[in-house]
Amino acid sequence: MKSCWSCWFSASPYLGVMLALCAWWLSWPEPPQPPAIISSEPIAQETLRFDEADTDEGAGLQVTLIPAPNFSAISLSDDRKQSFIAWLLPLIAQENARLLELRRKAVHYYGLSQQNRLSLAQKEWLVSLATDYEVNVGAKGFDLSFWQNLLHRVDAIPPSLVLTQAAVESGWGTSRLAKDAHNFFGIMCFKPGCGVPFDGGPGEFRRFTGVNDSIAFYMRIINTKGAYRAARAERMRHRLIGDVPSGMALAKTLLNYSELGSRYIDFLLKIMRENKLDEYDGADLPMTIEVNDAPAPSLQSEPVK
């Protein structure tokens, strides 16, 4: 993927971004077996919705969408960064909550599958989810390989990593792509007219209908594409030892995100450290649900499709 990270911006550290207001949005399930998952309302148009009978009691997370501030008009670098984080962080948390709820439901269905209690509707939901996350349902059906692939892919992305890449790729929200195409992650497309043309090579930068779509699409890329298999393995490694998945650790696996390779990774880590973005990976959310149907399958590795 070609990166548009070349937008220049300063990287002085900020001193907090109203943590009391934002921290409750950040959640990470308690790994592993069973994960503690937060309940959410799906937001993206392509979201796989639950049947009413399968929804959890209580209201899920909801985000009131507000237009992006004019970050270019904020003259002080620290103020611009704080505004960018305070605006984007709840939207990242909402998409993560959606992913964690899909994961919770998948783990619940794994438990049912071990007792041969999956209904036809539940099997159809699993097939739909697997299709959405590019997981094959082979001749053996929902075997160990299927569950390993699915649970490596249907999972949240560390908020620090999402914030860092959005900051780098959009110049803290000031780039033309972010303003005109809601593209905060340098994501490209290759059909004529699919996005915003650029000079210097084939393809265009993808145009999104809003920042929510941009975040969801970015997370789907990390969660499904072969180029980011190492990131998913690193995330699962953290889960298996009971750690919160680390954005800094995942960033070190993103050699394929930019043609700059290791230099891009070094820059991500620099921005993450200087702006203390890793602090956003450890906040707790009090709304959790535990799944106790069955122990999760062995998840040491994601099978090759």
Task: Name each region found by the language model.
Residues 2-164, 168-305:
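Catalytic cores of secreted/periplasmic lytic hydrolases that degrade extracellular macromolecules
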